[in-house]
């Protein structure tokens, strides 16, 4: 299968590795020194939890191909980058386009693709990996082979969608099919943003967070979940019902959060991303505020307190922006 991956950061790099590992002909879009590094040395990934290093040799281009034929194309970028690259994304000749990553402007993006006459299928997805891109390799944190949570923004995937991605990913990495991916993206934002507030509050070092601060973070996540439920969004992914309602699952989640915050996993999964992507986190929070505007009287005291303690987004971006 001919596969295109646009955006070779941590997430895009592992997705490209999974596609290469399954025997596909993979083309990646990587510019500048990073593109040169992949051409010269290969796509080198150190898998932190698995204690192994992989090297793949995808074909590297420095711009989104226009008119070249692919079976599947993955765009793995921030929501603002996806929108800025809309004209180039629309020009990709592929049976299926999958937009991967945090995105609270997904409906806008889908509408604009449709208005631009994009006739092929568009799915949205998220890959639960984290880490940091170094000068010559990627440090990747993942559990097991992981996979790609994926679905249309609204509705169910088609049989042809499932068959196509099943042919792309034939190893341990698999598509985790769901439905109505807008719900998935909203609940993910509700979980991630309080982690970001605490990370920035602690100087992008979760190890400095007190147990009480972590409790407040989990309470804020619960408020975000409750808001979305109030607005009629079913909990996503399925199985997370009751995770943040204050019961046994919540206490177990708090224990997991405490372990993550005290180890390198927290550094790679949360702190490094916050340190290198403050603009993305700001945009995600702005998007969630728009959702809050649909229920302006819904109380979120823990959320608001953490956001206030974190400080002004302009100051955060000025401190951590590159």
Describe each region flagged by the PLM.
Residues 182-225:
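Active-site-proximal catalytic alpha-helix in oxidoreductases
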Residues 43-61, 192:
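N-terminal glycine-rich dinucleotide-binding loop that anchors FAD/FMN and/or NAD(P) in oxidoreductases
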Residues 222, 229-322:
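NAD(P)-dependent Rossmann-like dehydrogenase/reductase catalytic/cofactor-binding core
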């Amino acid at each position: 299968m001919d596969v295109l991956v646009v955006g070779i950061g941590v997430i895009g790099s592992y997705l490209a590795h999974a596609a290469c590992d399954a025997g596909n002909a993979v083309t990646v879009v990587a510019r500048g020194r990073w593109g040169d590094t992949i051409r010269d040395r290969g796509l080198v990934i150190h898998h932190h939890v698995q204690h192994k290093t992989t090297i793949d040799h995808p074909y590297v281009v420095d711009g989104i191909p226009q008119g070249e034929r692919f079976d599947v194309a993955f765009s793995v970028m921030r929501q603002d980058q996806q929108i800025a690259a809309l004209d180039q994304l629309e020009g990709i000749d592929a049976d299926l386009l999958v937009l991967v990553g945090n995105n609270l402007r997904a409906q806008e993006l889908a509408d604009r693709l449709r208005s631009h006459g994009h006739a092929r299928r568009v799915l949205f997805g998220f890959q639960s990996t984290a880490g940091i891109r170094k000068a010559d390799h990627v440090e990747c944190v993942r559990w097991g082979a992981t996979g790609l949570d994926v679905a249309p923004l609204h509705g169910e995937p088609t049989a042809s969608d499932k068959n196509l991605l099943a042919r792309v990913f034939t190893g341990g990495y698999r598509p985790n099919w769901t439905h109505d991916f807008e719900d998935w993206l909203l609940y993910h934002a509700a979980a991630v943003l309080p982690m970001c507030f605490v990370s920035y509050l602690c100087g992008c070092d979760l190890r400095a967070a007190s147990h009480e601060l972590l409790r407040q973070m989990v309470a804020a996540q619960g408020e975000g979940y409750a808001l979305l439920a109030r607005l009629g969004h079913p909990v996503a992914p399925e199985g997370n019902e009751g995770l943040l309602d204050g019961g046994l699952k919540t206490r177990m989640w708090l224990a997991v959060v405490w372990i993550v915050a005290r180890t390198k996993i927290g550094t790679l999964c949360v702190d490094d991303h916050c340190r290198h992507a403050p603009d993305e986190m700001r945009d995600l929070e702005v998007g969630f505020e728009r959702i809050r505007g649909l229920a302006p009287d819904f109380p979120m005291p823990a959320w608001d307190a953490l956001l206030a303690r974190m400080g002004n987004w302009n100051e955060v971006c000025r401190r951590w922006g590159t």
